[in-house]
């Protein structure tokens, strides 16, 4: 929810509808940063929404933060983290800002000179990780943190953590019905995406059609690679025998190319390779996305340069 448009009455209404989890968009509490991104959202406004959620019985509250925003630096973001810790959300997502003005018109108002450089962004990220993990949050991986008592942390310790388009989850193999512009549904081995444009989305609904304009059905290789990638992202460890038995392959033969790509990670002690398993080391957890990407065949075959999920 957006605290700027969600008052206490709306929070109560959402809970009465049966919702029990809430994610708050914050980005940054610094006034200068908020002005630079045209999102004025005072701390007290977010605090009021969180208090209303607690009072109405929401079981879990997540807070989304973004680093790499204009006017942001280590000092300003440290204060934002202080305020986040004061509010004590159950989960925190710390995303990297992707500056893509050619794709997103509102970003064209942002001056490149106002953006922190790569070194500053990396320092902001590491500062935040240190502060959060020192204050009772577990680094789940892939930008996400949760309190040690949260079910995400418990699931990761037990090896039952899952991941979907919305992030990490404790619900294994659940289908996901997505509503809204550009959202993606997952049903079994099938994926379906809604239109990007609001006009196209509502036109389909008015005409009584499904608001879906494209889809994809996974093949056997896709399903195997999805399992490998998700296991690495969720557990930081992959047992070769589990893959062999589940998909009827010999891991070292099927993934010989990918294992070769692990050599630089092993050299820098980010990954540990054993005869029976692959393990992402403690200091390699921050790079788990990069490790998992090597098992994505489509990404390897693609010539496009990515820009959405880089670390810095």
What are these regions (language model features)?
Residues 1-252, 306, 310-312:
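C-terminal scaffold of the Radical SAM
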Residues 56, 131, 261-264, 268:
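Generic non-transmembrane alpha-helical segments
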Residues 250-266:
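Short amphipathic alpha-helical interaction segments
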Residues 230, 241, 260-263, 289:
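A generic structural signal for well-ordered alpha-helical surface patches
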Residues 283-312:
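Short, amphipathic alpha-helical interaction segments positioned at domain boundaries
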Residues 266-276:
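A short, conserved structural fragment
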Residues 277-281:
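Minor-groove-contacting beta-hairpin "wing" of winged helix-turn-helix DNA-binding domains
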């Amino acid at each position: 929810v957006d605290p700027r448009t969600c008052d206490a009455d709306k929070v109560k209404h959402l809970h009465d509808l049966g919702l029990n989890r809430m994610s708050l968009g914050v980005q940054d509490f610094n006034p200068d940063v908020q002005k630079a991104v045209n999102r004025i959202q005072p701390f007290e406004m977010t605090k009021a929404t969180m208090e209303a959620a607690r009072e109405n019985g929401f079981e879990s509250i997540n807070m989304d933060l973004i680093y790499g925003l204009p006017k942001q630096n280590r000092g300003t973001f440290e204060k934002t983290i202080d305020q986040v810790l004061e509010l004590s959300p159950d989960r925190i997502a710390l995303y990297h800002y992707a500056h893509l003005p050619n794709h997103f018109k509102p970003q064209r108002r942002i001056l490149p000179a106002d953006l922190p450089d790569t070194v500053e962004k990396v320092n902001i990220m590491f500062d935040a990780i240190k502060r959060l993990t020192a204050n009772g949050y577990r680094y789940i991986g892939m930008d996400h943190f949760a309190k040690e008592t949260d079910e995400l942390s418990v699931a990761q310790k037990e090896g039952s953590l899952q991941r979907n388009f919305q992030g990490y989850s404790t619900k294994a193999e659940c289908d996901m019905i997505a509503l809204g512009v550009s959202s993606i549904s997952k049903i079994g081995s099938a994926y379906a995406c809604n239109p990007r444009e609001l006009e196209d989305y509502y036109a389909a609904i008015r005409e009584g059609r499904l608001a879906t304009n494209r889809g994809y059905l996974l093949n056997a290789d896709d399903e195997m690679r999805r399992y490998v990638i998700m296991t690495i992202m969720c557990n930081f460890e992959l047992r070769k025998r589990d893959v062999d038995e589940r998909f009827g392959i010999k891991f070292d033969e099927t993934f010989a190319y990918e294992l070769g790509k692990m050599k630089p990670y092993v050299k820098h002690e980010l990954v540990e390779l054993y005869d029976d398993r692959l393990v992402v080391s403690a200091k390699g957890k921050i790079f788990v996305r990069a490790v998992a990407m090597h098992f994505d065949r489509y990404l390897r075959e693609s010539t496009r340069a990515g820009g959405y999920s880089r670390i810095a």
